[in-house]
């Protein structure tokens, strides 16, 4: 084999560590002199290095035993493929028949041993030598990491998510079904964790994140009696929800639809001012542009005072700006925004809904918004701010039904109310479910720094629900799942020259890596999380 004494010793230690037992004698290479017994024969002056159980058995064990029995073999010729034993008589016989009888019995003993045991030892030799050849083969300089996980992805298969939502006893009644993982196994979130934790859902368009989130929310309403407010920008599941949620309310904010909601009904001036600040992005950012925002905030305050006093909010918008004494740019911006918002905010008679009644047990409010109409986007922001106001106004010493607020495509709903609600509504038995692409958090509102938005969302969403990602920025979310320690082995250039293996040495170290790397997220099948 050409292995050095150090390599043979290292192999023995690794064999004992991996198999929890010492290596068998066939695994211990040793210097064997096949002709070393007598010094005669053509192989008496040669030495060989190899892992050969037959050499160790016949040369190291059997021959001394036969020598003690009275036989003195002179030469044993051995090869690595076959074993040919030739015994030459060097007996100093004095004509005694017993000496020759002992020699013949020893020869018969050796012959029967070759026939019966040689095949077994040959198979053991081949297995051990094959393993050693793989270890001593040529290997380029590389870095390898070991990990306990085996990311062997299976087919997603067909999953009837609603079929898993059954009534009765069993493990499924105590958890919320989210889908299947990369191994094809169901993922269940315990009920206690579901009602105490905000969840962030990330994935490509069409990966199934909205569908599975809808299934989870249906179960929350139907089986657990939760109240759900669902903000959706497209409305693809509006026809599915009434069949599973009897207390279903649809609020369509798309352009061309009749007014269905009065956001300003029964509001005091402070709550109304906060709605205007959230809808028009009037929060201070710390930049020089805050000079104009302060004037616009004064205008929003005056509008709120006039509305609470009985004036019309649409007519009082311009007067409020002028009364605030703001600069010309501030007056123009507020007049334009108030004009854009005047029509959708005015409800039609007989179609008004009071938002406070929607937070009852087993109710689902489904809001269809828009991703391109600025007026509708502002209404969405103010509607969520109103939901947060209702939740925060709950009596903390009273038991309320759990509420879940689903924000699909959070980019079009981002405001300071959303970020503050991640931490404030949890104390009122309410949690948020945020669905978006990883890069969409950077496209926040003009009053929200992108880094501040990203940090706040990550810190307040312990559960991250990942689907298949394509872009590098989306795959970077894998680093948010925590890290594990792995072993890194670096080997120098290695090669083989004849029967000798040459190696420059190895170095082992430990390093950290994400629990789920980018390859895991990129190769998830459709329907897996």
Swiss-Prot record:
Originating species: Escherichia coli
Function: This protein is essential to promote the specific transfer of the plasmid in the presence of conjugative plasmids.
Record region (Disordered): 311-356
Name of this protein: Mobilization protein A
Superkingdom of the organism of origin: Bacteria
Basic and acidic residues: compositionally biased ranges: 328-356
Keywords: Conjugation, Mobility protein, Plasmid
